[in-house]
Amino acid sequence: MAKYRKLGRTSSQRKALLRSQVTALIENGKIVTTEARAKEVKKMAEKLITLAVKEKDNFETVKVSAKVPKKDAEGKRVKEVVDGKKVTVYETVEKEIKKDLPSRLHARKQMDKVLYTVTEVPTAAAGKKKNTKTVDLTNKLFDEIAPKYAGRQGGYTRIVKIGLRKGDAAMEVLLELV
């Protein structure tokens, strides 16, 4: 008996397909796909969300001091002349950061194995690299999705049947986070 569906693809194609669909589900909250794919994606997504729920509070806050370049009103670095050279002026800033404990770090690395990095491009800058930003989906899992499902014991996703696809009559479904 097989542990998973083969989806009519080679192993590398299947893994890439499932990873991309899990990434899309976590990023957007819902995807439309075939029933067989949805059942496989559901398994993977549920495991990631369970990991996030277990490890969401497993961090410590640490105070860190960092040197940051001083900036003027226009946002440019302030320069100072020292021994005939222009040198950037730095100021020390105290910040509080979240430091993952070992179990949460391991969970983060397990999630990064499955999820692709997502680059968000604003519609005004479509096709350009300027103003793009990468979205950290592991942080989204820990900070947004895990607190939402904190009191829930599994069943984080729902499959809703839409109907048959026109081209090949495959059953299409909507897979969404509950």
Curated annotation (Swiss-Prot):
Coiled-coil annotated spans: none
Keywords assigned by UniProt, alphabetized: Ribonucleoprotein, Ribosomal protein
GO biological process: translation
Taxonomic superkingdom: Bacteria
Entry GO MF terms: structural constituent of ribosome
Cellular component terms (Gene Ontology): cytosolic large ribosomal subunit
HAMAP family linked: Ribosomal_bL17
Quaternary structure note: Part of the 50S ribosomal subunit. Contacts protein L32.
Similarity comment text for this entry: Belongs to the bacterial ribosomal protein bL17 family.
Protein name: Large ribosomal subunit protein bL17
Organism: Lachnospira eligens (strain ATCC 27750 / DSM 3376 / VPI C15-48 / C15-B4)
